[in-house]
Amino acid sequence: GQEYIQTANEEFHTDLVEFYEEYMAATENNKDLNESKFALDNKRARGFFTLLEKLEERPEAINAVKGQITGPITFATGVKDQNKKAIFYEEQIRDAAVKHLGLIAAWQTEQLSKYNLPVIVFFDEPALAGFGSSEFISISKKEVMDCFSEVNEYVQQRGALTGIHVCANADWSIILDSETNILSFDAYSFFDKLLIFSDSLQNFLQKGGQIAWGIVPTQEKEDIDRENIDNLYSRFTEQLEQLAKDTNLSKQSILRQIYITPSCGTGSLDRERAEKVLSLTRGVSDKIRSELIL
């Protein structure tokens, strides 16, 4: 069966008080996050510690390093209480969940900052695809943006950039109108849906926002098998042309504010396809650098 949080008993309320004490110690009394409950361990975050090991080897030509964590909306709408009600709807528990995720992201930022490279932390928000649907009818845009504002702050005040990744279609204005630095989206499948928000996109880019342009497919194996660098490059150039036209911004200014990325993660793919996705990403990026950037 599905696990849930038992919010009705006394033990939960004791735990909640303890959580806020730990939170206050970390945020107001400068307790070292590494000594707090917000520090991850190898059992909970094996991939993160593998990344740190690789960074210790100081491989050449790294320009930045990126962490990732479940976003507050996806977490708080996915975790339920004993009545199968999402904890997002319980204001006190939602507040604790947002602070919990924000401080784990802050801990990640501190760990990644040791390598003297620019740090980016992404919040993964697949649930945003459901915003505005009947399932989330009572959740307001302001509530969502307040959650983003808080988690962004924990990371940004430590000198890192934040991103929000959604691998489906979404109301992109929520991210574009927030203080998030980077919008990460599946440009392979949903580019036309993003263009609907051209005004928000223009404002976002003009205030220095960046786009992680997921032009390399990861969702359908047939797409991965079929695609090559030239196809994806020409798809990208068409999209760039369209974005420049719709936002009234120059292609060169847009090119300075984008990253070429896979459309989503490769964790569900076999190794051969995962490696192809990464080499396509590198190949498309190199081709754009050599042929488009002045």
Report the location of each language-model feature:
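Active-site loop segments of alpha/beta catalytic cores
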Residues: 64-67, 85-199, 213, 217-219, ...
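Alpha/beta catalytic barrel-like cores
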Residues: 1-90, 177, 181, 209, ...
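Noncatalytic linker/hinge segments flanking ATPase motor cores
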Residues: 17-29, 104-113, 159-169, 203-209, ...
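Short helix-terminating capping/connector loops at secondary-structure junctions
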Residues: 59-63, 113-118, 157, 206, ...
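Catalytic-face loop-and-helix region of soluble metabolic enzyme cores
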Residues: 181-294
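Glycine-rich anion/phosphate-binding loops
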Residues: 36-53, 91-107, 231-239
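Alpha-helical structural signal in soluble globular domains
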Residues: 54, 111, 150, 154-158, ...
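Short, solvent-exposed loop/turn segments at secondary-structure junctions
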Residues: 72-74, 128, 218, 265
